[in-house]
């Protein structure tokens, strides 16, 4: 039987070699060279985080809050480098989430993983 950690490292290597990761890395490197773009993304992510925190605390997230974030996204996405970065980041995050789901589902660990196990 193979060591699960060795397999995890193989998966990490495969992910690093994927087109999705390479696309993300190239987009990130482009953004990191421009302080204005970095700041725009940082501001957007901060607002996105604040909205998610509100939601998690059970506070009301108004349609105005959502609209404001959507407007900000539309504005910053007019820059092709930012749009490419956010798109590549979203695709990579989806792959990682899919991998986590595949693992959790295959070992029937989903409920335990998220704290919903029957006691």
Swiss-Prot record:
It holds the Pfam family Com_YlbF. Gene3D superfamilies: YheA/YmcA-like (1.20.1500.10). InterPro entries: Com_YlbF, YheA/YmcA-like_dom_sf. HAMAP family: UPF0342. Belongs to the UPF0342 family. This is UPF0342 protein Athe_0692. The lineage of its organism: Bacteria, Bacillati, Bacillota, Bacillota incertae sedis, Caldicellulosiruptorales.
């Amino acid at each position: 039987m193979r060591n699960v950690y060795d397999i995890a490292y193989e998966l990490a290597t495969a992910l690093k070699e994927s087109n999705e990761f390479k696309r993300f890395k190239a987009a990130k490197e482009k953004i990191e060279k421009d302080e204005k773009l970095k700041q725009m993304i940082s501001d957007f992510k901060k607002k996105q985080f604040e909205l998610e925190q509100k939601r998690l605390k059970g506070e009301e997230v108004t349609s105005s809050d959502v609209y404001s974030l959507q407007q900000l996204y539309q504005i910053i996405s007019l820059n092709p480098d930012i749009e490419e970065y956010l798109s590549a980041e979203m695709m990579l995050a989806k792959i990682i989430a899919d991998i986590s789901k595949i693992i959790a589902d295959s070992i029937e660990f989903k409920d335990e993983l998220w704290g919903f196990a029957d006691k």
